[in-house]
Each structure stands twice: as C-alpha cells, then as structure tokens.
C-alpha cells in the first residue's frame, strides 16, 4: 500500500511538472528523491526513482504541449504569431517552418 501511495504521489508530481513555468525541474527532482526514499524495497525504489526522474526531465523539456503530434495546435499558433510560419512538433520540441522528415 505504501508503494502504491508513493507511486500515486509521483504521478501527481509529473502532472504538475507538465504545467511548466510554475516550478523548476530541480524541485520536482528533489520531490522524486524524497518520495522514493519511502519505498521499502530497494530494487523497486531504484527502478521507480530512475523512471520518475527520466519522466520528469522529459516532460519539463516539453514545449507547447508537443508530444510527437501538435494535438492542441499551440506550436502552430505560437509559430504563426512569432515568425508567420507553420509550426511542427519534433518529438517534444516545437520548430517553426521545419517539417518533420520521418
């Protein structure tokens, strides 16, 4: 039960991290360290800690909610406003005027 509660708290941290701008990534990484220290099984603790840190890092690098596809059109709108070019999601990055080649 304690492990499930800790994993749930980690998911809440990841959700907050995806909001961006409110807090820096390092604060979420410290939260991951604190929460995973409460998992009693060492192997599970290490796996969950590693996965959560990678997830927090990837989500915090996200631009305009890009996740391979621009589902909410924020990338396109920001590029049209800034450079008057179409915006395309390249993984988690938004690039203006550069089409995806894959």
From Swiss-Prot:
Instruction: List all disulphide bridges recorded for this chain.
Output: 66-89, 75-94, 79-96
Arranged from A to Z, the UniProt key words for this protein are: Disulfide bond, Secreted, Signal, Toxin
Its source organism is Urodacus yaschenkoi (Inland robust scorpion)
Species classification:
Eukaryota, Metazoa, Ecdysozoa, Arthropoda, Chelicerata
Keyword set includes Cell cycle = no
Please give the GO cellular component terms listed in this UniProt entry.
Answer: extracellular region
Q: Which domain of life is it from?
A: Eukaryota
> Main localisation, per the record?
secreted
Expression by tissue: Expressed by the venom gland.
Q: Where is the signal peptide?
A: 1-19
Q: Where in or outside the cell?
A: Secreted
The answer to whether UniProt assigns keyword Disulfide bond to this entry is yes
The record's InterPro entries line, in alphabetical order, gives: Long_scorpion_toxin_alpha/beta
Question: Boundaries of each BetaSPN-type CS-alpha/beta domain copy?
Answer: 63-102
Protein name in the entry:
Scorpine-like-2
Q: Which family does it belong to?
A: Belongs to the long chain scorpion toxin family. Class 3 subfamily.
Q: What does this protein do?
A: Inhibits voltage-gated potassium channels.
Record-level Gene Ontology MF annotations: toxin activity
